[in-house]
Amino acid sequence: MASTSGVGSVGPASCCETQKPHTIRELCLAQQITYPCIQLCCHYCYKILSVLDIYAFDQSCLYLSWGEGGPTGICSQCTRVLARLEFTARHEVSCAASRLPHFIGQSLSDLEVRCVRCLALLQSVEKDYILREDLSVHRIGGIWRGTCVRCMVGLY
């Protein structure tokens, strides 16, 4: 499961790990390499991430996990499986986006929202679309989730 200390987290695990790169971009800068040259294994299935997996992980604003073997990411397939497992195990509530201010006192546009399918951090234009179409949003493990454009159109 995504947590504050592992793959898919939204922030550094602890103050003791501040010297380690948290993102793929930071790792590339630290190692003075580019995307096509970086090699990371998936934290869950141990396969080497493809260039597309690395790009998707970075664009999703997910953080690297550090272990004895170095940093790991998460491949696209495992990301989707993890998102489904989290929905099943940690789902708290769902509601229409327009009801959110009545429910929690905040608008969707004021919240950090991740994709329910691929865990990507939603951009403001995606949140605006969810609000305009009054789509469902879900609170899963304390994090609000909606569906990103890539998943809406079937690209991910």
From Swiss-Prot:
DNA-binding as UniProt keyword: yes
Record keywords: Activator, DNA-binding, Early protein, Host cytoplasm, Host nucleus, Host-virus interaction, Inhibition of host innate immune response by virus, Metal-binding, Modulation of host cell apoptosis by virus, Transcription, Transcription regulation, Viral immunoevasion, Zinc, Zinc-finger
GO CC, alphabetical: host cell cytoplasm; host cell nucleus
UniProt-recorded Gene Ontology molecular function terms: DNA binding; zinc ion binding
Biological processes, Gene Ontology terms: DNA-templated transcription; regulation of DNA-templated transcription; symbiont-mediated perturbation of host apoptosis; symbiont-mediated perturbation of host ubiquitin-like protein modification; symbiont-mediated suppression of host innate immune response; symbiont-mediated suppression of host type I interferon-mediated signaling pathway
Zinc finger residue extent: unnamed: 42-78, 115-151
Location relative to the cell: Host cytoplasm; Host nucleus
Keyword Lyase: no
Chief place of localization: host cell
Gene3D superfamilies referenced in this protein's UniProt entry, alphabetically: E6 early regulatory protein
Family: Belongs to the papillomaviridae E6 protein family.
Subunit structure: Forms homodimers. Interacts with ubiquitin-protein ligase UBE3A/E6-AP; this interaction stimulates UBE3A ubiquitin activity. Interacts with host BAK1.
Function in brief: Plays a major role in the induction and maintenance of cellular transformation. E6 associates with host UBE3A/E6-AP ubiquitin-protein ligase and modulates its activity. Protects host keratinocytes from apoptosis by mediating the degradation of host BAK1. May also inhibit host immune response.
Protein name: Protein E6
Primary gene name: E6
